Design a protein with these regions (language model features):
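N-terminal loops that bind phosphate or other acidic moieties
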Residues: 5-133, 137-377
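Methionine residue identity
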Residues: 1-2
Length: 377
């Protein structure tokens, strides 16, 4: 067991493993291993999150506050219980992926439920929001959300178009009235978390990049993409908004572009919010050893994840940093950033695997890593 004159400061910052193991649980297994090998180690865990998962739980591991459970609607307008939180320092945290789910055709899915959650928070005085919109089952360009917040869509005959019925209704829209939007929105500040690069429509749209993993045909994806283009044209004509060129605007099926253009939202990566909430850079600066990693299996359109940010900071402050990952997909990037050593549990990250078994594997790798370091310190 390693022993030092001063307590060794160890930073443990594991991201999730493809929905199998949460950031919190991955951290716990790694911490157990460190604790078994380094006497009196001063271990700090940083629960991470990304633009799809882990946001709510991770934030409330660092901050105190109140979590609410409210009845809203899922992507298919079925009643569902949603959970969101408000921290004591005024940050409202919403993880849209928790309740914006559906099993039917994406043309019939709506983002109305997210609007309901935002409305509930606004009614409780919320002014600052952090919202992750990735991983939802909606591609309605945020139209359902806008309707829940007070916007009205009209057809040629002046009749209302009901966007709770999904993107398929977009083709009927001719006029948009936002005068009835919730009055508190004008004072609200939104931070939208996105770790994946996509536009609202076109070759780089979210739907065109992901339709195969969503089990859609290319023809179905093109139909959705064309409707999103039409919706953006309506919004340009009616509200003078340019949705198509917003960087990362395709997240949440186009919700990110709406947040940016209508509500002047700040689009940010998850690691930027991690920095903001946890003081990650200072924790890296103080650490003697950093153990980090992830099992996020997203090949084509990853912008950045917190693990890459940690590697950058470790290089900046010349720290010993060990990556414990589900796969080797980011190893070249880690290598370029000077990560000390890298280990992967799988050749390809599985979609199903016993969580405890994965945790034990991480713990075993960590024990061996620390033993190697112990032999050279």
């Amino acid at each position: 067991m390693m022993s030092r004159g001063d307590n060794m400061k160890v930073l443990v910052a594991m991201d999730e493993f493809n929905g199998i193991l949460s950031s919190y649980d991955a951290n716990r297994f790694v911490e157990e291993a460190v604790d078994s090998q380094i006497e009196d180690a001063d271990i700090v865990q940083v629960p991470l999150f990304n633009g799809r998962h882990e946001l709510l739980n991770s934030v409330f591991m660092w901050k105190s506050g109140t979590q609410y459970r409210i009845d809203v609607h899922d992507a298919e307008m079925n009643e569902i219980e949603a959970q969101y939180g408000q921290t004591e320092d005024g940050l409202t945290v919403i993880q849209a992926e928790q309740f914006q789910k559906g099993t039917g055709h994406y043309l019939n899915h709506t983002s109305y439920g997210l609007g309901e959650v935002i409305q509930h928070a606004l009614n409780k005085g919320a002014k600052t929001f952090a919202i992750s919109v990735g991983g939802t089952d909606t591609f309605d360009g945020g139209a359902g959300m806008l309707q829940a917040l007070g916007a009205v869509f009209y057809d040629d005959d002046g009749e209302r178009v009901d966007m709770t019925k999904g993107l398929g209704q977009v083709k009927h829209i001719r006029r948009v009235d936002t005068s009835g939007l919730h009055p508190q929105l004008k004072d609200a500040h939104f931070q939208i978390l996105i770790d994946f690069s996509s536009k609202m429509y076109g070759k780089q749209s979210a739907i065109m990049q992901s339709y195969k993993t969503l089990h859609l045909s290319r023809e179905e994806a093109v139909e959705i993409d064309n409707l999103l283009w039409y919706f953006s044209e309506i919004m340009k004509h009616e509200l003078k908004l340019s949705l198509g060129q917003i960087e990362r605007g395709g997240a949440g099926g186009g919700m990110a572009a709406i947040f940016k253009t209508i509500f002047n939202a700040e689009i940010m990566t998850s690691h930027e919010l991690v920095d903001q909430i946890t003081g990650l850079e200072n924790l890296v600066k103080q650490a003697d050893l950093i153990l980090f990693g992830e099992g996020i299996n997203e090949r084509d359109h990853v912008i950045n994840t917190s693990s890459l940010r940690i590697a950058e900071l470790a290089q900046q402050y010349q720290k010993v940093a060990i990556a414990l990952c589900g796969t080797s997909e980011k190893f070249e990037q880690y290598e370029n950033l000077g990560v000390t050593a890298m280990f992967n549990a799988f050749d390809e990250m599985p979609t199903e695997y016993p969580d405890f078994k994965l945790g034990v594997t991480l713990r075993a790798y960590t024990v061996q890593v620390v033993k190697l370091l112990n032999a050279h310190i």
